[in-house]
Amino acid sequence: MIRVAVIGGSGYTGGELLRILAVHPKIEVTYVTSREYAGKPITLVHPNLRGFYNMNFSQFSFDKLGDKADAVFLGLPHKVSLEYVPKILEMGIQVIDLSADFRLKDPTLYKIWYGYEHPYPDLLKKAVYGLPELHYEELKNAKLIASPGCNATATILAGAPLVASSLLETYKLISDVKVGSSEGGAKPHEGSHHPERQNAIRPYEADGHRHAAEAEQELSLIAKRDVKVSLVPHAVSSVRGALASVHGWLSSDISEMDMWKKSIEFYKGRKFIRIIRSNIHPYPDPKFVIGSNFADIGFAIEKRMQRITMFSAIDNLMKGAAGQAVQAFNISRGFEEDEGLRIPPLRPA
C-alpha cells in the first residue's frame, strides 16, 4: 500500500481527493492537514465522508510527513506550494501539486501571468504536466506532477484534436468556458456567495485568464508551432461542471464524419475521453459527467463561416482537479490509470 498525505485537505479539492482516495485499493491515507481545522475531525468539514474517515486534521509538520507518507497531494493556494515542494522532494517523497506553481515550463511566464519571479526554474524543467491524455509516458515514475487547472484542462482537451489536424487557417483560438461555483473554492466571498452567484452568467478575467498560458503551452506542443488562446471564463450558477467551447477557423472544408474520425483517432485508447455525437444530446454537457473523471468531447462545423467549434465538458472538481491528479498519480506508480476512478457520472445531477 502506498501511504498518501493530503496537505490542505479542508477545501473542495481536498475533500474530493479524500472522497476518491477513500476507495482506492492501492493507497492508505495516513496524514491530512489543515491550518484552520487542525485537531478537528475530517468529517466535521466533509460530512459526506462519514463512515470512511475516523481521523482528525493535523497541523502540518515536515517531521511528521517524513514518517507518514510516500506521496503527497498538495491542495494549497498558488505561491504557497513553493514553500513546500522543494523540501518534500528532498525528503524523497513524491509530490502531486494541484496549484499552478509548477505547470508552466517557461519561468518568465510566471511574472507575466502570476506576478512573481519563479524561484525554482530547475524544478519547472523536472515537473511533468499532469494531463494524462497528452503526457502518459512522461508521467511514468514522475516525482513532481503539476496538475492542470480546470479551465485549462477543458480548453486543451477540446482544442487538442483540432490543432493536431493541420486544418486551421490561423492558430489563434477563442475558448469560452462556463464553470460552476465550486471553482471559486470553499471560502465564500462576494462574487461566489450563493445569492450573488445564483442566476448569474458572469464573465471574469475576460482580458486574459491565466489558464490561457497552460493552454498555449500544451496546444503549441501538439501543433509543433505557436498557438495563441484567448480564454474567457464565465461564472454560472451550477455548483460543478465546466464546458469549454473552443472556436477556430478552417483553412479548407472538412466533413463532420472526417472530424469525428480525427477526434476518435487522437484520443484512441484514452479511458476517460468520450467522443459525443447523438440525436438527443448532440453536444457535450457537464450535466452528464458530474461526479466522474470523464471528459466528453464534441464539435460543430459552421460551413458558411468556415468555423469549427470543439466542445469539452468536465466536472471541474474531478477531471479538472482531484480526479485528474489521482489519474496522473496512478500512471506514475504503474497502476491502471482508472484505479479508484471507476465511477460513473451522477444522474440526475
Curated annotation (Swiss-Prot):
Broad EC category: oxidoreductase
Catalytic activity: [amino-group carrier protein]-C-terminal-N-(1-carboxy-5-oxopentan-1-yl)-L-glutamine + phosphate + NADP(+) = [amino-group carrier protein]-C-terminal-N-(1-carboxy-5-phosphooxy-5-oxopentan-1-yl)-L-glutamine + NADPH + H(+); [amino-group carrier protein]-C-terminal-gamma-(L-glutamyl-5-semialdehyde)-L-glutamate + phosphate + NADP(+) = [amino-group carrier protein]-C-terminal-gamma-(5-phospho-L-glutamyl)-L-glutamate + NADPH + H(+)
Main location, first listed in the record: cytoplasm
Gene Ontology molecular function, alphabetical: N-acetyl-gamma-aminoadipyl-phosphate reductase activity; N-acetyl-gamma-glutamyl-phosphate reductase activity; NAD binding; NADP+ binding
Residue ranges of coiled coil: none
One GO-annotated biological process of the protein: L-arginine biosynthetic process
Pathway: Amino-acid biosynthesis; L-lysine biosynthesis via AAA pathway; L-lysine from L-alpha-aminoadipate (Thermus route): step 3/5; Amino-acid biosynthesis; L-arginine biosynthesis
Transmembrane segments: none
Binding site for NADP(+): 10-13, 316
Cellular localisation: Cytoplasm
Residues at the active site: 150
Highest taxon of source: Archaea
The enzyme's E.C. designation: 1.2.1.103, 1.2.1.106
InterPro entries to which the protein is assigned, alphabetical: AGPR_type-1, LysY, NAD(P)-bd_dom_sf, NAGSA_dehydrogenase, Semialdehyde_DH_NAD-bd
UniProt record similarity statement: Belongs to the NAGSA dehydrogenase family. Type 1 subfamily. LysY sub-subfamily.
Protein name: [LysW]-L-2-aminoadipate/[LysW]-L-glutamate phosphate reductase
Species the sequence originates in: Sulfurisphaera tokodaii (strain DSM 16993 / JCM 10545 / NBRC 100140 / 7)
Lineage, highest ranks first: Archaea, Thermoproteota, Thermoprotei, Sulfolobales, Sulfolobaceae
